[in-house]
Design a protein with these regions (language model features):
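Flexible beta-alpha connector loops of hexameric P-loop NTPases
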Residues: 5-8, 33, 58, 80-88, ...
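Short regulatory helix/loop adjacent to the ATP-binding pocket of P-loop NTPases
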Residues: 73, 158-168, 198
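Conserved P-loop NTPase
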Residues: 1-2, 99-106, 112, 168, ...
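The Walker A/P-loop phosphate-binding site
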Residues: 1-78, 95, 99
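Substrate-engagement module of ASCE P-loop NTPases
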Residues: 127-148, 152, 168-179
Length: 275
């Protein structure tokens, strides 16, 4: 079998392309998960409208009406004239739309509401998620198109549905939203066509997701003046170095056993470092 270099499809977001390994690969299936309100749908709608200026894109929503989608796009000031949209949850009908429109990229929001009409189980069940994911994976390979699946997560932080879902897809990303922060981090956990653990950073604004061009600036709170108990250091995230700030506060203790507490660092890991 001869290996052919695939022409990647840029998303219009350098941070998203970084996590993908340079853009979407034709014939691949991408899964993006995250907490409710993290911005998964917002990010993908922005990327879809940007892609639609040069590529055929089909955005399928199963969780909101077309009117709601249009209102969201209007609020974000996104051009919708070149984007094909559909409100549908039946996998077979979506396949017919793909056959008829021949898009290069298909967004499905979300995999947990998609269903196969031949199955008796309810949408979101283990059987439905497994079979619809398998169906869309075959569809992507058959037509050499990109299919992006939005996935809900459980209370434990994993993707809702069978574990086999993560094995079917080619790329798995998580969009995290730290409590009380407007910043979002997109991290790749699996990528058959690029490096894993790549990190993309965005800021949620009134007009949607904006890329953070200099992530080190948001991790450093120190000024030019030296501050006792504070240092700047470098950490690697994927292929990118980031400057972060470490702060320490020491106080006298009357008890026989001093207590060590860390914010942003696992307590067991802290104990190992201090041992």
């Amino acid at each position: 079998v001869e290996a052919v270099e695939a022409q990647r499809i840029g998303t219009g977001f350098a941070e998203l392309d970084r996590v993908l390994g340079g853009g979407f690969v034709p014939g691949s299936v991408v899964l993006i998960g995250g907490d409710p309100g993290a911005g998964k749908s917002t990010l993908l709608l922005q990327a879809s409208t940007a892609l639609a200026q040069h590529q055929g894109v089909l955005y399928v929503t199963g969780e909101e009406s077309l009117q709601q989608l249009a209102l969201r796009a209007k609020r974000l000031q996104l051009p919708m004239e070149h984007l094909s949209v559909a409100a549908e949850t039946r996998a077979e009908v979506i396949a017919q739309l793909v056959e008829r429109q021949r898009p290069k990229v298909v967004i499905l929001d979300s995999i947990q509401v998609m269903q196969m009409e031949a199955l008796d189980s309810t949408p979101g069940s283990v059987t439905q998620v497994r079979e619809t994911a398998s169906f869309f994976t075959r569809l992507a390979k058959q037509h050499d198109i990109v299919i992006v699946l939005v996935g809900h997560i459980t209370k434990e932080g994993g993707i809702a549905g069978p574990k086999v879902l993560e094995h079917m897809i080619d790329c798995f990303m998580m969009l995290d939203s730290p409590a009380g922060s407007r910043y979002r981090t997109l991290r790749g956990h699996k990528n058959r066509f690029g490096a894993v653990n790549e990190l993309g950073i965005f800021a949620m604004t009134d007009l949607g997701m904006k890329e953070v061009a200099n992530p080190s600036a948001i991790f450093l709170q120190r000024g030019d003046v030296d501050s006792p108990g504070s240092i700047a250091t470098v950490t690697w995230e994927g292929t990118r170095p980031l400057l972060v700030e470490l702060q320490a506060l020491v106080d006298d203790v009357a008890a026989g056993h001093p207590k060590r507490v860390a914010v942003g660092l696992d307590q067991q890991r802290l104990a190992m470092h201090l041992a």
